[in-house]
Amino acid sequence: MNNARPIRRALLSVSDKTGILEFAQALHAQGVELLSTGGTARLLADNGVPVIEVSDYTGHPEIMDGRVKTLHPKVHGGILARRGIDEIVMEQNNIKPIDLVAVNLYPFAATVAQEGCTLADAIENIDIGGPTMVRSTAKNHKDTTIIVNAKDYGRVIAEMQSNEASTTLETRFDLAIAAFEHTAAYDGMIANYFGTKVPAHSNDECHEDSKFPRTYNTQLVKKQDLRYGENSHQTAAFYVDTNLDEASVATAVQLQGKALSYNNIADTDSALECVKEFDEPACVIVKHANPCGVAIGENLLEAYNRAFQTDPTSAFGGIIAFNGELDAATASAIVERQFVEVIIAPKVSQAARDVIAAKANVRLLECGEWAAKTTSLDYKRVNGGLLLQDRDQGMVGLDDVKVVSKRQPTAEEMKDLMFCWKVAKFVKSNAIVYAKNSMTIGVGAGQMSRVYSAKVAGIKAADEGLEVQNSVMASDAFFPFRDGIDAAAEAGISCIIQPGGSIRDEEIIAAADEHGMAMVFTGMRHFRH
C-alpha cells in the first residue's frame, strides 16, 4: 500500500495516563522504539517497558521546572521531516524520524473549574510543548501519526498489526483532523478564561470582569446528519457540546425508532427542559415547541392521562417527556391512545421498552437522571451574530411572591399558581396558561397581544370540555391593560399569577378586585421568543 507509513519510533507524553501503558506495551511488541517525558516515562519504566527519556534523546535536560522539555529541533525535526526530501538535513543534524506521537494536554479546563483556582494555577496548566507537537505531527500527517485521544490507541494498534506495523493515509488524515479540533478547543478554552478576567495588583491573582469574553469560543461536535432541516428544502445536522454532561436531548441515548428529525430534537428539548421543573411525577406533551399539556400526578400514568386530557387534538404527533422511569403501564396507555413522535425519560424499564417495541417508528430516548441545574449559557442566532445569555433558571417560591389583591389565594389556588408559573416559563410569548388541580386546562401561546393569548387559552379549555371555573392563570409578563383580566374573569379564572411591573399595575389590580379575583406578583418575567 503506497500511502502506508511504518511506525518505528514513537513519542508518548500524556497527562491522562488512561490506556497508555497497554498502548506502549503493544507498540514495543511491534518493535517500536519509545521516547517519553516525565511521569509518562516513569510509568513505562516502572512497568518494564523500554523507554528513552526525551532529554537523553536530545542531549538537553528538561529546564525551568519542566516548562521546556520537547521544544527541540531533534524532536520537531523528527516529526516534521518530509520523508524522501529531508533525509540529508536530518543526517547533518543527527535527527531521527519520529513516526507517531501520542499526546494529551495539561488539564486546563479542569484546573480553572476548581474553586480557588488562581491565575498562577491557570497559567501553569497552559500546555506549550504538547500543542506544538500535536500541530507538528498533524501538519505532517502524510508521514506521521498523531493521537490525542486514548480511544484511538486500539484503532492504531489494530491497523499496525494488520498492516506490517504501518498506518494508512486515511487513518492519519482522520487523526490529524481530530488533533486540530483538539488544539482549537484547547486554545478556545484558554481564550475564554482570560477574556473574562482583569489582572489584580498581584501577578498571581485576577478578578472576573464578565462572564462574556471579548471573543467567544466554543466547539460543537457533529452527533449526526439529519434528513433535512426545519423544512424539507433545508439541509441540517445536529452538533453537541461535549463539555456538558447534564441530562439533555444532546446526551440522550436513542433506544429505538426512526432517526430523529430537526424538529424532533428541538421539540424534545422543550419538553424535557419543562418536565425538569417538577419534583412530583410529571408529564409534558409538546407540539411545535410549546407545551400543549402538562400535569403532575401520583404516578407517571396519572400524570400522562391528565396531560393528554388538556388537548388531545394537539397531542397527536407530539413529543412526550417524563421526569421518572417510564413503566409498562404508562407506555401501554400512550401507544394505545395516540400517535407519538418521541418519548423521552430519564430511564425506561425493560417492560416499557417491550411495549413500545410494537410501534417500531416511535423514537424512544433515555436521557439519564438530572441533578442540580447547570450554569451554561443560552444561545440565539441572528443574522451576522450570536446572542448569549444566562439560561432562564429563575424560580419563585411561596415566600417570594406578593399578594397584591384584596382577596388572598387559598392554599389550593397557591399550589396551582406555582404549578402554572413553571409551565408558563416554557410557553412562547405572549404566554397565558390556565390550570386547575396541577393540570393545564388551556394554553395560549405566541399571540402578539396578551389578551388574545388569554382568549386562546379559554377557547382551548372550552373545546376540550374542561371546567375553567375557579381555575388559575399564569402570564409570563405583566398585563399592559385590564382587558386580559376581564377576559380571564369572563372565562371563570379565580386567581392570577404574573410578574407585575406595568405602569398600569394599579388599574390591573383594581380589575382583579372588581372581579373578586386573587392576584399574585412574582417580580420576575419569563419571556420566551
Swiss-Prot record:
Molecular function terms from GO: IMP cyclohydrolase activity; phosphoribosylaminoimidazolecarboxamide formyltransferase activity
Keyword Secreted appears in the UniProt entry: no
Pathway, per record: Purine metabolism; IMP biosynthesis via de novo pathway; 5-formamido-1-(5-phospho-D-ribosyl)imidazole-4-carboxamide from 5-amino-1-(5-phospho-D-ribosyl)imidazole-4-carboxamide (10-formyl THF route): step 1/1; Purine metabolism; IMP biosynthesis via de novo pathway; IMP from 5-formamido-1-(5-phospho-D-ribosyl)imidazole-4-carboxamide: step 1/1
InterPro entries listed in its UniProt record: AICAR_Tfase_dup_dom_sf, Cytidine_deaminase-like, MGS-like_dom, MGS-like_dom_sf, PurH-like
Catalytic activity: (6R)-10-formyltetrahydrofolate + 5-amino-1-(5-phospho-beta-D-ribosyl)imidazole-4-carboxamide = 5-formamido-1-(5-phospho-D-ribosyl)imidazole-4-carboxamide + (6S)-5,6,7,8-tetrahydrofolate; IMP + H2O = 5-formamido-1-(5-phospho-D-ribosyl)imidazole-4-carboxamide
Coiled coil: none
GO biological process: 'de novo' IMP biosynthetic process
The organism's place on the tree of life at top rank: Bacteria
Keywords noted in UniProt: Hydrolase, Multifunctional enzyme, Purine biosynthesis, Transferase
Record-linked PROSITE patterns: MGS
GO-annotated cellular components: cytosol
Keyword DNA repair among record annotations: no
EC number(s) given by UniProt: 2.1.2.3, 3.5.4.10
Residue stretches making up the MGS-like domain: 1-148
Similarity comment: Belongs to the PurH family.
Protein name: Bifunctional purine biosynthesis protein PurH
Organism in which the protein naturally occurs: Shewanella pealeana (strain ATCC 700345 / ANG-SQ1)
Gene this protein is translated from: purH
